[in-house]
Structure formats: C-alpha cells, structure tokens
Amino acid sequence: MRTLWIVAVWLMGVEGDLSQFGDMINKKTGTFGLFSYIYYGCYCGWGGKGKPQDATDRCCFVHDCCYGSVNGCDPKLSTYSYSFQNGDIVCGDDDPCLRAVCECDRVAAICFGENMNTYDKKYMLYSLFDCKEESEKC
C-alpha cells in the first residue's frame, strides 16, 4: 500500500499540502522533506500500525492522529496558506479545516526538527510487516 502511495505522489507531482508539508519539513530539518520520512518506521507514510519505533516515528503517529481529527476537507489534498516568519511556521487560513490541516503539518515538522537525533537509518524503508505490536490509540 505504501508503494502505491509513493508512486501516486510522484505521478501527481506532490500536489496540495503534501508539497507544503514537505516544504515545512525542509525548513525545520534541512532534509529533503517528504522523501526523508515517507517510509520511515511504522507510521511515516501512508497508513500505519503497531508501536512507533522511536520519537521520529511518534511524530508521524501524532500527525496521523491529527489528520484523523480533521473534518470538512481531505488533509492530504487540501492546499492551505502559511508562511515562515523568523524561523517559525505560521498558518494563515481563515477556513477552519484548512487551518487545522496546516497546524497538523506545522506541529509534525517542528517535531521532526526537535527529534532529528532519534532519526535512525535502520527505520528507513521499514516494512509494515515488521510493525507487529498492538497499535496505540490516538
């Protein structure tokens, strides 16, 4: 399933807030955003199950939970407005749904930046088949 998602992202040119989320990650981590995290651990990328493998994976778990609480728009396809001011990400939408999506992405990007020391290459390209522990609740 995750393979299909990454192919879809490549084919559609990373539209909507996925590219915006990637931009936020780039600014907060200095990494190549989405592609540094797309297959990381049990929760970074499409879907997720099991126990987050480390603090970086937990950022993705919390992000998934946040997206799950958004009502009124599709978080992965919505385009919102945001800016960078003095190194901070500022969400600027009046639409409550778009603002919520932006806040989910903002918090995750900050979380990635704060937890870069936990990023472990052994969790890159991690298979969901290895995520066997019981899933946590949001």
Swiss-Prot record:
Reported cofactor(s): Ca(2+)
Broad EC category: hydrolase
Enzyme Commission number(s): 3.1.1.4
Classification via SUPFAM superfamilies: Phospholipase A2, PLA2
Transmembrane region(s): none
Catalytic activity: a 1,2-diacyl-sn-glycero-3-phosphocholine + H2O = a 1-acyl-sn-glycero-3-phosphocholine + a fatty acid + H(+)
Cystines in this chain: C42-C131, C44-C60, C59-C111, C65-C138, C66-C104, C73-C97, C91-C102
Keywords: Calcium, Disulfide bond, Hemostasis impairing toxin, Hydrolase, Lipid degradation, Lipid metabolism, Metal-binding, Platelet aggregation inhibiting toxin, Secreted, Signal, Toxin
Active site: H63, D105
Subcellular location per the Swiss-Prot or TrEMBL entry: Secreted
Keyword Disulfide bond: yes
Main location: secreted
Amino-acid positions noted as binding Ca(2+) in the UniProt annotation, renumbered to this chain: Y43, G45, G47, D64
Family of the protein in this entry: Belongs to the phospholipase A2 family. Group II subfamily. D49 sub-subfamily.
Protein name according to UniProt: Acidic phospholipase A2 1
